Amino acid sequence: MVLSKSHAKGGKDMKKMKRVVAMLLAVVMVFGLAACGSKKSGDDSGKEEKSNYPEKQITLICPLAAGGGSDTISRLFAAAMEKELGVSVVVENKPGAGAGVGLEAIASSNPDGYTIGYIPAEVTTVEAMGNATVTPEDFEYICTAMKISALICVPADSEWDSLDDLIAAAKENPGSITIGTAGVGNAYELGLRSMLEAAGIELNIVNFSGGTAEAITAMMGGNVQCCTAGTAEAISYVNSGEFKVLCNLSSEPSELLPDVPTATELGYECNGGSWGAFAVPAGTPDDVIEVLRKAGEKVMNADDFKKTLSEKGFDEYHVDGAEFKKDAMEMYKTNSDIIKEFNLSAN
């Protein structure tokens, strides 16, 4: 059979068209597989990045000296977090400048989750005091750790049995009664000054650079007539009968000393309590913060951890890490105003 030229040409065109279609299908398949592979790879890498943290040792910076309440809570937390995270958590103390040195070190550390920090209430005062440039805004909070009520204490043989007794004596002899406190601008002193202003009295405030321990020693030695102290520092003296507690300068009663009235309840509004939290520097990835928050929540809610806190003189304090930043910033603004009002300074 002999084909016409037009029929032969049509056959060639048909073959050519099939080859083009086949090539196009091949290209589509190649790009489709590549896209799927890329998507799968991207998903896997994201999951892998999340699941891999933490992979190495974590450093926990405590901005206050070894041996104190902040150091104690930092070491308790580090040991518990090791069990939750499966890596070593090592505490490094960086005291100085009213916690300013350590807070600056935490805020300026690499925001990769391998440096976390204990954040004391001083983060709300160090800037106004001139000790550092950090504020609560420079951190993302893992969890709150505890709170410490600020107390006005006197020796067991003191003539004063209540805050009203102290106020009456101060009104009779303005500025003659001495009270020791743990350094200029500390949370206890700020609460004390607010209470004195509300009561309309004046005490001779003696600041001790050695902290609350030095103030207690001075009171027990008769060098000052009363002192401010946190529950963690005072509880053993109270239990042994060496101290009387006239009032709690915090806004709420202490779970450890529920029968001690707050100054606010007595009509003299103030909030001189201290607290502690754990945080990472601002800019830390959200997935890393999430891992730390979940672990921190487990630690803080564990019964054995709560029991240890109570034994050490700390009250429980649970505020969501994400929400706590707002609370801390409010405290920062309030304390900054008090520091300016009373012209307090580290210098």
Where do the protein language model's features map onto the residues?
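Extracytoplasmic/secreted proteins, especially bacterial periplasmic and envelope-associated proteins
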Residues: 72, 76, 80, 84, ...
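Ligand-binding pocket segment of bilobal, Venus flytrap-like solute-binding proteins
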Residues: 176, 180-184, 188-260
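Short, low-complexity disordered leader/linker segments with a strong preference
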Residues: 1-59, 345-347
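Hinge/capping helix and adjacent helix->loop/strand transition within the periplasmic-binding protein
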Residues: 108-114, 128-214, 275-308
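Residue-level signal for nonpolar/aromatic packing positions in well-ordered secondary structure
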Residues: 29, 58, 67, 74, ...
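C-terminal lobe and pocket-closing loops
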Residues: 233-301, 333
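N-terminal (or domain-start) structured segment
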Residues: 47-138, 176, 201-225, 316-318, ...
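An extracytoplasmic/periplasmic, membrane-proximal ligand-sensing/linker region
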Residues: 55-57, 197-198, 203, 287-347
